């Protein structure tokens, strides 16, 4: 008999759980915008894809940064120049009492720069990416990414994850 394997308590059971967490972050972001009298963001498939690339890059490299693993700026993940980015590395121990979406939104809302991105009326669309990884200290964590694009902006391509140089 093989021993039973049990997932980590903080790990989502499947992709549907991760998708639900991403949607919860989008919903919470739009609730914050509504509280501030700002129009809701629409979800962009291309921004969702790009945000996931950014989260995956950080999870693969273990480096939490607005600079991509190959040294390029975060906005090179798409062909749009009008992208804003919020990132957070959320260690598993921080998720003991509250959900990932609630915890990361609290952290972003407590930071003036992150809050400014979430409440910027110039932005019209959002994408969210989440990836499980380890941080620079070897701690299990989630890399959380929000990407924002100006109203009327467009993306024709999304880059592949960049490798460390």
Q: PLM ranges: what are they?
A:
Residues 8-20, 34-44, 85-98, 102-105:
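Second-shell loop/turn segments in exported
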Residues 1-13, 160-165:
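Ser/Thr/Gly/Pro-rich low-complexity, disordered linker/stalk segments of secreted
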Residues 151-160:
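Short, charged low-complexity linker/loop segments at the C-terminal edge of domains
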Residues 4-6, 64, 112, 144:
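Intrinsically disordered, low-complexity regions enriched for glutamine and histidine
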Residues 13-75, 121-127, 131:
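Short, well-ordered surface patches within globular domains
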Residues 73-152:
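A well-ordered secondary-structure block
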Residues 2-4, 22, 34, 46, ...:
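Context-gated lysine
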